[in-house]
Regions:
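Substrate-binding pocket helix/loop in short-chain dehydrogenase/reductase
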Residues: 94-96, 102-107
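Active-site helix of classical SDR
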Residues: 118, 154
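C-terminal helical subdomain
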Residues: 178, 194-236
């Protein structure tokens, strides 16, 4: 049986490049996004270019009924070997300048839909005793700006969720990778989705979607659990992660810290 990869947010940017690269590796594809015309064009192009079977699945992952369609596919198709949880969006503005609906929409796509799809995919992976889950987070998972409180919060969830799954599935043939891109040349900037134009960013700080995905897949091949496509010194992450563990260990004390002087 041929292996199938499901890619969300596949109509452009990082998702479209994942679709291309996975097709080149011989995967059949299910391409998930809101824009049906773009999906159909991409699917046809990949079918011709690589001789694989790519099919579009039009779904808005901010809509519960559409998420359920993708969940059903993930639980019913035994050929599915990989899920790339790429769909997401961010509005970079202060909470005071954001509508509640907009903030909740980010949470619905970046957290709720991602979790539902991961849950559905992992059910199938466990039954088949193998699979690959790739969750796309962001460098803002570990850094907040005055304009990124909601977006950073959603991506911090993706990182923590993925790390927990990695521990949960450590002794299985199911791989979980979390990818944390920095600024990447995608429609989140060029189509005004973020609220900040691409021209406002220093060009040397912006990575192409192609380089981002190629680095992420190289990290997957190398067995990385956490991939930072733009970070040259991997020791920085190792130090960060070790410090996180040390801080957690320091919380496991049943008494207030001496600096609070509660004994006086």
């Amino acid at each position: 049986m041929s292996k199938t990869a499901v890619v969300t947010g596949a109509s452009s940017g990082i998702g479209a490049i994942y679709a291309d690269r996975l097709a080149a590796r011989g995967y059949d594809l299910v391409l998930v996004a809101r824009r049906g015309e773009r999906l159909a064009t991409l699917a046809e192009s990949l079918n011709k270019k690589y001789g694989i079977k790519a099919q579009p699945l039009v779904a808005d992952l901010g809509n519960d009924a559409d998420v359920a369609k993708v969940e059903k596919l993930l639980t019913s198709d035994p050929s599915i070997h990989m899920l790339v949880n790429n769909a997401g969006f961010g509005r970079l503005r202060s909470l005071a300048d954001s509508s509640l609906d907009d903030s909740l929409s980010q949470i619905a796509v970046n957290i709720t839909a991602l979790t539902k799809l991961a849950h559905a995919a992992l059910d199938g992976f466990r039954a088949r005793k193998e699979g690959v889950l790739i969750n796309i987070a962001s460098v803002l998972a570990v850094h907040s700006l005055p304009i990124s409180s909601v977006y950073s919060g959603t991506k911090a969830y993706v990182l923590a969720f993925s790390r927990g799954l990695q521990d949960e599935l450590a002794n299985t043939n199911i791989k979980v990778q979390v990818v944390l891109p920095g600024s990447t040349d995608t429609e989140i900037w060029t189509e005004g989705i973020s609220g900040i134009p691409l021209s406002a960013l220093s060009p040397e700080r912006v990575m192409t979607a192609e380089n981002c995905v190629d680095a992420a897949l190289a990290g997957l091949d190398a067995g990385e659990l956490v991939t930072w496509p733009s970070v040259a010194d991997d020791g920085l992450w190792q130090t960060f992660d070790k410090t996180r563990q040390t801080l957690f260990d320091a919380t496991q004390v049943g008494a207030p810290a001496p600096r609070y002087e509660l004994s006086k």
